[in-house]
A protein has these predicted regions:
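Active-site helix/loop module of the DD-peptidase/beta-lactamase fold
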Residues: 114-152, 193-227
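Bacterial Sec-dependent N-terminal signal peptides
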Residues: 1-26
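Penicillin-binding protein/beta-lactamase superfamily catalytic region
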Residues: 170, 206-272
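Second-shell loop/turn segments in exported
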Residues: 44-47, 90-95, 132-135, 169-175, ...
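Non-transmembrane alpha-helical segments in soluble domains
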Residues: 60, 109, 124, 145-149, ...
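Structural recognition of the beta-strand scaffold that forms the well-ordered cores
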Residues: 70-74, 79-82, 97, 146-149, ...
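N-terminal leader/targeting segments and the immediately adjacent pre-domain N-terminus
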Residues: 17-89, 94, 112-117, 149, ...
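Active-site SXXK
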Residues: 77, 94-120, 147, 184-189, ...
């Protein structure tokens, strides 16, 4: 998976970037938030950080070998490295793939803090009775939280999220399985906010962080597309626990919950 290659590349760079004992340059310890529009973005160099400059080219070679499209490293919001490969450009979009689930979770958290829903609400409060192919008793066990934590108990064998495929395997909360039924959260937010999901997402998250991009609501996958810089913007939001500049865009408690164990079946999983 490409996202794994990006992450592995980042780890390799960090492990290869040693400090120079003869240089004592101060780190840019103040957090920087790029302007919401335009291409202005502060940078800091590898040399300024006293990182290992000799490791940069081997890293680039590795990224090319792994068919990487875009690669960025930020320190406190400032760009240290920004590289594009294999014909990709700064203005070109790319799929977030599974990382887009984090955007869905964050948007759900914003809807909760605005009082539009509680993640403890039944999913059927928003999706209506009969949104699954399960008995009513079993369907009513599924909460918004279950969709966030992959514990709906719905059969994950078929990734096409249509009613005939949403069949019972286990009671909600008793089984963890990675699947596409999380996509129903976009419908939950849409109903709760009385608008379509993308409009709500744009207003509450995308525009407030200066991201670009769009959602592709396909028959199997719901995928966000954007530039690498937009993904970096979301990274800055995450680094600051849901805060952008002086605005708490997503509740810090929800953000903390989302990156910690959310249930006792798969302790490695938070919210999407």
């Amino acid at each position: 998976m490409k996202l794994f290659a990006y992450f592995l590349s980042f780890l390799l760079l960090i492990s290869g970037c040693s400090k120079n004992d003869n240089t004592n340059q101060p780190l840019p310890d103040t957090m920087y938030f790029p302007p919401l529009s335009g291409n202005e973005w502060e940078t800091v160099s590898v040399a300024d950080l006293s990182w290992n400059q000799n490791a940069v080219q081997p890293l680039k070679d590795f990224l090319i070998q792994k068919n990487t499209m875009a690669f960025m490293i930020l320190v406190n919001g400032r760009i240290v490295m920004e590289e594009y490969f294999n014909g990709h450009t700064p203005s070109a979009g790319w799929e977030w793939n599974s990382a887009g689930k984090t955007l869905v979770a964050t948007t759900t958290g914003i809807a909760q803090q605005e009082g539009l829903l509680s993640i403890n609400d039944k999913a059927s409060d928003f999706l209506g009775t009969g949104w699954t192919n399960m008995s009513l008793a079993k369907e009513n066990l599924i909460t918004v939280r279950n969709l966030l934590t992959m514990t709906s108990g719905i059969d994950d064998a078929n990734q096409l999220v249509i009613k005939p495929n949403l069949t019972y395997v286990a009671d909600a909360g008793t089984r963890w399985a990675y699947g596409n039924v999380f996509q129903k959260l976009t419908d939950v937010v849409s109903v709760a906010g009385n608008t379509d999901f993308e409009t709500y997402f744009n207003e509450k998250l995308k525009n407030k962080t200066g991201m670009d991009g769009y959602w592709n609501f396909g028959t199997i996958f719901t995928i966000y597309h954007s530039t690498a810089r937009s993904m970096a913007r979301f990274g800055i939001l995450a680094l600051n626990k849901g805060k952008w500049n002086n605005e708490q865009i997503v509740d810090e408690q929800f953000f903390t919950e989302s990156i910690n164990t959310s249930q006792n079946i798969n302790p490695s999983y938070g919210y999407l």
